[in-house]
């Protein structure tokens, strides 16, 4: 949803991050509460307050800092530092910033799927940026076949190199990895866009694929 964009300087989330407003809409409230649940389940390894770290490492449109001061940044990263009170966001520290990029596509997929079901669709496949949700069967009358990309560095060819395919008739699927959005620092270390909020550093896992009943949750996991 547009209100959760960190790339649009006029979005509600961008204004919240700049401290210009503490008002929340239904989309941010829903996703913040869902994110908090997964933050607790993951013991903080998933956390939407990760934005200062994402910025410091040079993702989300920012230039990477030569040597990010992780100890300093981690002081205002943590899901326990934000609270919802009467429809407004309360931050324990004004420097806390939110980034819903890890959940926004999956959430949008779920919204589109819900709209299709309200319109009477029994068979559909919704896909946005690699996140998908399906129900029923394809036009061939068989379960949907969803390809899982081979995770080698620089694989930018959608569907050209696949590890395998999954047959699905219901549910959401999300794949995330470090083989597309990454760079190498001066020492040759690979820095991926997936940041562990507990350490402040990028993760080394190559690729994950998750299946859930709803795409928003698959995206989160």
Report the location of each language-model feature.
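Mature catalytic core of soluble alpha/beta enzymes
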Residues: 1-215, 221
């Amino acid at each position: 949803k547009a209100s959760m964009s960190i790339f649009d300087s006029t979005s509600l989330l961008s204004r919240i991050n700049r401290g210009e407003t503490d008002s929340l809409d239904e989309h941010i409230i829903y996703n913040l509460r869902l994110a908090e649940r997964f933050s607790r389940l993951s013991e903080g390894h998933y956390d939407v307050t990760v934005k200062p770290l994402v910025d410091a490492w040079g993702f989300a449109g920012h230039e990477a800092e030569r040597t990010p001061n992780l100890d300093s940044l981690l002081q205002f990263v943590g899901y326990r530092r934000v609270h919802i009170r009467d429809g407004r966001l309360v931050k324990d520290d004004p420097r806390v910033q939110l980034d819903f990029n890890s959940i926004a596509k999956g959430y949008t997929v779920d919204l589109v799927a819900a709209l299709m079901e309200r319109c009477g669709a029994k068979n559909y496949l919704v896909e946005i940026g690699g996140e998908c949700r399906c129900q029923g069967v394809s036009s061939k009358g068989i379960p949907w076949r969803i390809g899982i990309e081979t995770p080698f560095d620089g694989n930018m060819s959608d569907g050209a190199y696949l590890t395998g395919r999954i047959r699905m008739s219901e549910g959401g699927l999300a794949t995330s990895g470090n083989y597309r959005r990454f760079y190498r620092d001066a020492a040759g270390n690979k820095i991926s866009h997936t940041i562990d909020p507990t350490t402040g550093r990028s993760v080394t896992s190559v690729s994950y694929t998750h299946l859930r009943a709803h795409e928003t949750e698959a995206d989160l996991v």
